[in-house]
Amino acid sequence: MTTMTRRELLKASATTGLVLGAPAILSAQSKAPINIGTLCPLTGAGGSYGPDMQRSVVAVVERINKAGGIHGRPVQLFHEDDQTNAEAGVRAARKLIDVNKVVAIVSTWASAVTLAVKPLCVETQVFLIGVSGADAVTQGDHKGYVARTQPNTKLQGSMYAKFVVSKKEWKRVAYLALQTPYARSFGDAFNGIVRAAGATITDDLIYEDKKPSYRSEVTRILATNPDLIMLEGYTPDSVVMAKDIYKAGFKGAILAPSFAVNAKFIEGAGPDVAEGIWNMDRAPLFDSPAYKEFTAAVPRNDTSPYAPQAWDQISIVALALAAGKGEASGTVIKDNLRAVANPPGTVVYSFAEGAKLLGEGKKINYEGASGSCDFDLVGDILSAPFAVQQVRKGKSELVTVINP
């Protein structure tokens, strides 16, 4: 696997965006480029995922430009690191919007970042699409300029709960979550379904970030005698929390999001602490032609859903622009989003397939590497299967897939 440093990733910006597709641009494209920005977390808590997300976008744009671009115009990429930090994300978004004049920003990760840059995008009519889960991302009057490929927290909470209630030995469940924009809405959805199924929520605790120890929180949770701890945090805090839970002698089960329980988590927590921890996230469409093309183009060491979602985000944005009449703007993207991503229409798995049919005046339905990308009226995806994994001998292994 070829890896890129943060410096190398950030150098893949304005000039690189053109160079990547240079042969196609020189031979088939003479019009002004369409500027699109990425705002991935190359550093910070999401730094495990941002580089692969960015590589995915670059790979798709290479293909778009080799196929002749969008209405004969090449796509030019501009990359910024949001640092998994809202303030840094706003500064980066302002640069993309004001200096680079992008029509879309793709692949934001943390909900706090997406929520911070959302008003800027709505005000300037720049289309924003990311993988953030907080319900607030698509709430309010965003005028259609915001969408996501990651399930919202209500859908996530319900899918986690569906798995939990299938395990009859988990009768007593404690909810333990980092203070984030999604913690409360996820917990409400999760706890409600678990209770309705007859299990007991023994405690519901939201904890602060960046504490050197969570012994007091662990003591409180374990005093309720749970069979399962639903741990909803990011990787850094989850490492500290899992260590403290292990040291306290907890013999029950832990379930967490896969974006927290990743290779860095296993390395940081250690194999003994990590062993047996369950984790879940959206399942890619493993058998899809789009997923197969994605895996060949973006080799990586994990199966997290964010890189394939980034692949789909740039594909959908490009197809929405192709469905327009030549104008490239955030408004064209939001007006054509569902026309290219939702049924009815011929199922397509790539920009080249879709652009060809659109050019023939036909309807299309993009199915991507991450699965179906069917959006409701507020920009949420309608449904998604979830992969259930468990850490076994130092690696997260797929156990089953839970369907809606």
Descriptions of predicted regions:
Residues T2-A12, T16, G21-A22, S27-P404:
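Extracytosolic ligand-binding ectodomains
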